[in-house]
């Protein structure tokens, strides 16, 4: 049987670094909620069996009317960290018929620049891979190491062979679940899915990402994201 595709959107964060009382995934950008752009990109990929949004149990900001017409499901099973929210979401996918052999693409709600084309490129590249992988970009900037709490440069780090991880991150549901469970048992709270897969001894691949697909994190990021989203994805 051909493995099916599922999308998982952890959306339980508060976005404290964004400088807003409203979680950043619900901020309005170019006329729509930031989360809308992620859901619309996956909705356009009709080959996906389901897109699952993981909310915090006490999320009072989510309003389904802002996402009318898009195909997705919601579960209020978010945990205290991204890793916990993703694990809880993976367990919920069984309710939609997902099996361990199926693929899941985990995507940050705060990356509204994702496009159906990038999603499909990732799937086409990795669908026959035994492990899976992520979209990422080669590091372009010069990297400086500064001690925690300080402002003096300790040294310049080589950027050779360094890539900046993005999402979606695509792995088999069973492999990812077991990798996260192992990380939890060993006391690690990892910041992305590839880290858990690596911790379990596997080797994920990288697929060329896009500058458009950056993560909205700081207050100044919203204006940049709005400018990008106001333009067609293929605009030069």
Curated annotation (Swiss-Prot):
Keywords, ordered alphabetically: Isoprene biosynthesis, Nucleotidyltransferase, Transferase
Intrachain disulfide bonds: none
Pfam families xref list: IspD (PF01128)
Record site: Transition state stabilizer: 17, 24
Gene Ontology process terms (BP): isopentenyl diphosphate biosynthetic process, methylerythritol 4-phosphate pathway
Keyword Transferase set for record: yes
Entry's EC annotation: 2.7.7.60
Any one GO molecular function term: 2-C-methyl-D-erythritol 4-phosphate cytidylyltransferase activity
Reaction(s) catalysed (UniProt annotation): 2-C-methyl-D-erythritol 4-phosphate + CTP + H(+) = 4-CDP-2-C-methyl-D-erythritol + diphosphate
Site (Positions MEP for the nucleophilic attack): 159, 215
Top-rank EC class of the record's enzyme: transferase
InterPro entries per UniProt: IspD, IspD/TarI, IspD/TarI_cytidylyltransf_bact, ISPD_synthase_CS, Nucleotide-diphossugar_trans
Alphabetical list of Gene3D superfamilies matching this protein: Spore Coat Polysaccharide Biosynthesis Protein SpsA, Chain A (3.90.550.10)
Pathway note: Isoprenoid biosynthesis; isopentenyl diphosphate biosynthesis via DXP pathway; isopentenyl diphosphate from 1-deoxy-D-xylulose 5-phosphate: step 2/6
Keyword DNA-binding belongs to the record: no
Family to which this protein belongs: Belongs to the IspD/TarI cytidylyltransferase family. IspD subfamily.
Annotated PANTHER family: 2-C-METHYL-D-ERYTHRITOL 4-PHOSPHATE CYTIDYLYLTRANSFERASE, CHLOROPLASTIC
Protein function: Catalyzes the formation of 4-diphosphocytidyl-2-C-methyl-D-erythritol from CTP and 2-C-methyl-D-erythritol 4-phosphate (MEP).
Protein name: 2-C-methyl-D-erythritol 4-phosphate cytidylyltransferase
Organism whose genome encodes this protein: Burkholderia cenocepacia (strain ATCC BAA-245 / DSM 16553 / LMG 16656 / NCTC 13227 / J2315 / CF5610)
Organism placement in taxonomy: Bacteria, Pseudomonadati, Pseudomonadota, Betaproteobacteria, Burkholderiales
């Amino acid at each position: 049987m051909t493995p099916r595709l599922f999308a998982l959107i952890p959306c339980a964060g508060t976005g404290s670094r964004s400088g807003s009382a409203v979680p950043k995934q619900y901020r309005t950008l170019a006329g729509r909620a930031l989360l809308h752009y992620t859901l619309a990109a996956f909705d356009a990929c009709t080959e996906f069996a389901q897109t699952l949004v993981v909310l915090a149990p006490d999320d009072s900001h989510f309003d389904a009317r802002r996402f009318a017409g898009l195909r997705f499901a919601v579960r209020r099973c978010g945990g205290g960290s991204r890793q916990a929210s993703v694990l809880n979401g993976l367990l919920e996918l069984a309710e939609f018929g997902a099996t361990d052999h199926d693929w899941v693409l985990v995507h940050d709600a705060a990356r509204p620049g994702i496009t159906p084309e990038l999603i499909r490129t990732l799937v086409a590249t990795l669908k026959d891979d035994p492990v899976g992988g992520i979209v990422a970009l080669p590091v372009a900037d010069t990297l400086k190491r500064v001690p925690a709490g300080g402002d003096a440069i300790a040294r310049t780090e080589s950027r050779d062979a360094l890539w900046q991880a993005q999402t979606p991150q695509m792995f088999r549901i069973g492999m990812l679940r077991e990798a996260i469970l192992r990380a939890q048992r060993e006391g690690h709270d990892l910041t992305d899915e590839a880290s858990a897969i690596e911790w379990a001894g596997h080797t994920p691949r990288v697929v060329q990402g896009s500058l458009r697909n950056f993560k909205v994190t700081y207050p100044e990021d919203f204006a940049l994201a709005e400018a990008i989203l106001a333009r067609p994805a293929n605009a030069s």
